[in-house]
């Protein structure tokens, strides 16, 4: 999730080998700051989002290009503007079009500050013990229809939330909940209720 973005470059440096790693980062001002920070650790960045605007289309083309070249793309399913811990279908569409699996990944730190931003951004404090937690791959069939895409979106959302909350509680921390139903756009409320997502 977007709240766990800060430490992702460290993960890839330890497990990624020589395969190039790209992070999808918002083109907004806060995204530019994050982009410069991430670049310091080696990953490349793709500016934009997987939304349906002009910038989103350009970002999606770049994502597909690097995935088909055998590179890896890191994306925050609820970025860049939320709602918190509620996945959009952009990552599902990208995985479907590129015919690649999605690997959920999260982290937590034993001593941290939770910011008051929309995503409840996690800031690890010095001398913390950190834990990175990978989930099982999520495979996306290229022939999925709208119903199938929504099912995969919910699968990703539930899987990553469960993984994140287990990582927090495993360190003795209080789990951060997803945005409540009343915080969501109307079009997402019925889908979440139908999917049984907490």
List PLM regions with ranges.
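Catalytic core of membrane glycerolipid acyltransferases/transacylases, capturing the structured
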Residues: 1-53
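Residue-level preference for the first positions of well-ordered beta-strands
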Residues: 20, 70-74, 103
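Short gly/pro/ser/thr-enriched loop/turn and capping motifs at secondary-structure boundaries
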Residues: 30-32, 53, 82-83, 109-114
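Short, hinge-like loop/turn segments at secondary-structure boundaries
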Residues: 40-42, 64-65, 119-124
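Generic beta-sheet signal
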Residues: 48, 76, 104-107
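Catalytic-site beta-strand/loop segments enriched in glycine and acidic/polar residues
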Residues: 60-94, 98
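Membrane-interfacial terminal anchoring regions of lipid-handling membrane enzymes
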Residues: 68, 150-198
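A cross-family acyltransferase "interaction/gating" segment
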Residues: 85-146, 192
């Amino acid at each position: 999730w977007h709240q766990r973005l800060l430490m992702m470059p460290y993960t890839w440096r330890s497990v990624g080998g020589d395969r190039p790693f790209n992070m999808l980062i918002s083109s907004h001002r806060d995204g530019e700051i994050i982009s410069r920070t991430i670049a310091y650790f080696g990953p490349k960045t793709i500016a934009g989002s997987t939304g349906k605007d002009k910038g989103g289309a350009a970002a999606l083309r770049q994502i597909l290009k690097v995935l088909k070249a055998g590179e890896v793309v890191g994306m925050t399913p609820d970025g860049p503007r939320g709602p918190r811990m509620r996945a959009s279908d952009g990552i599902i569409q990208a995985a479907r079009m590129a015919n690649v699996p999605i690997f959920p990944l999260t982290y937590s730190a034993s001593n941290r500050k939770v910011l008051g931003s929309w995503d409840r951004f996690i800031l690890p404090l010095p001398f913390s013990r950190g834990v990175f937690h990978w989930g099982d791959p999520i495979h996306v069939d290229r022939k999925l229809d709208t119903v199938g895409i929504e099912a995969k979106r919910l699968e990703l959302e539930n899987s990553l939330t469960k993984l994140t909350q287990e990582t927090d509680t495993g360190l003795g921390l209080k789990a951060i909940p997803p945005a409540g139903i009343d915080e969501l756009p109307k079009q997402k409320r019925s889908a979440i209720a139908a999917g049984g997502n907490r």
